[in-house]
Amino acid sequence: MASRKESAASGSNPLDFPVKQIQVDGLVVLKIIKHYQEEGQGSEVVQGVLLGLVVEDRLEITNCFPFPQHTEDDVEFDEVQYQMEMMRSLRHVNIDHLHVGWYQSTYYGSFVSRALLDSQFSYQHAIEESVVLIYDPLKTAQGSLCLKAYRLTPKLMEICKEKDFTPEGLKKAAVAYEHMFEEVPIFIKNSHLINVLMWDLQEKSTLADKHELLNLSSSNHLEKSLQLLMDRVDDMSQDIVKYNTYCRNLSKQQQQKQQYQQRRQQENAQRQSRGEPPLPEEDISKMFKAPQAPPRMDTLLIAGQINNYCQNIKEFTSQNLGKLFMAEALQSNSS
C-alpha cells in the first residue's frame, strides 16, 4: 500500500490529503495514449491501473498497465486476480508495484458519473493518496496533451462512507457539485536522455507554416459538446421535477398530519368537558408515512457534468475567438 506509515502512527486525519502534486513519468503518458489508440473506439472508455510511490508531499506515478477489454458474458475473467498477477510480475522485475490509483479516458469530457465516483471512493478509501487520471484524446488530437488528476474531497468521502444521499444529508454536509472533485496539479518528468532527444528532434524538425496556428478548430467539437450539454440539462430537469413532486407530497402530508392532530385535540377537549376519558394514543408515524426522498447524488453528478461541459465550451470558444481577432489584425496589416 502506498500510504505513509508515519501519518498513521502520528494519528493524523487520513482525509487531510498530504499529497499536493503528482509527478507522472513520460512512459506512463505514452502507455495511456497507446492504450486508447489500440483499444479505444469513439465513446468507448479504456481504463488501467497506476503504479508508483509517495515521496513526502509528492505522488510519483512511474508505471501503469491496462485493464483488458472483456464483456459481461466473460464470467471467467477475474479483474482482481488479474491485477494481483500483474503487480506480482512487476515486482519480480524490480519495477514499482505499489497501487496508487487508476486512469480512464473520456469522451468530450464526459467522465463525471456514478461509476467513476464509486470506483474512486473504493480506491481512495483503501489508499488515501489514490487519484484518477483523466485522459481526453480529442483535445490531445488538437495539439495539446489533456491529462488531469482528480480525487474526492473530504466532504464527499464522508458522505460516501455514511451513504446518506438524502437532501437533508447533503444539505447538512454542505456538499455541492463544486465540492465533489478536486484537481491535483501534475507535471511530467522525463529522463535527461529523453529531454536531449526531444531537443534534438525539435531542432531538426522543419518549421511549419505559422498561419496554421490560426486555423479554427472543427465545429463538430462544439456541436457535439452542445448536444451532450442539452442531454444533461434534460436529465437535470427531470430530476428537478421528481424533487418538486416529492416536496409537494411532503408538504401535503405535513398539512394533513397537522389537521388530524388538531381534530384530535378538539375532540379530546370536548370529551374532557363531558367527563369522558380521552381517545387512546395512536402512532401517527404509521398513519402518515413520509414519502421516500429521491437520492440527490445523481443530481449532483449531473450538475458537475454540466459544469464540466460549460468549461469545455468556454475554452473552445475563447480559443477560436482569439484566433479570429489575430487573423483580422494580420489581414488589416497586410492590406
UniProtKB/Swiss-Prot annotation:
Coiled-coil ranges per UniProt: none
Subcellular location: Cytoplasm
Predominant cellular place of this UniProt entry's protein: cytoplasm
GO molecular function: metallopeptidase activity; translation initiation factor activity
GO CC, alphabetical: eukaryotic 43S preinitiation complex; eukaryotic 48S preinitiation complex; eukaryotic translation initiation factor 3 complex
Residue span(s) of domain MPN: 22-156
Region described as Disordered: 254-282
GO BP terms, alphabetized: brain development; formation of cytoplasmic translation initiation complex; lateral line development; regulation of translation; translational initiation; vasculature development
Alphabetical keyword list: Cytoplasm, Initiation factor, Protein biosynthesis
Extent of Low complexity compositional bias: 254-272
Similarity field: Belongs to the eIF-3 subunit H family.
Chain's role: Component of the eukaryotic translation initiation factor 3 (eIF-3) complex, which is involved in protein synthesis of a specialized repertoire of mRNAs and, together with other initiation factors, stimulates binding of mRNA and methionyl-tRNAi to the 40S ribosome. The eIF-3 complex specifically targets and initiates translation of a subset of mRNAs involved in cell proliferation.
Subunit-level organization: Component of the eukaryotic translation initiation factor 3 (eIF-3) complex, which is composed of 13 subunits: eif3a, eif3b, eif3c, eif3d, eif3e, eif3f, eif3g, eif3h, eif3i, eif3j, eif3k, eif3l and eif3m.
HAMAP family xref list: eIF3h
Protein name: Eukaryotic translation initiation factor 3 subunit H-A
Organism: Danio rerio (Zebrafish)
Taxonomic lineage from the root: Eukaryota, Metazoa, Chordata, Craniata, Vertebrata
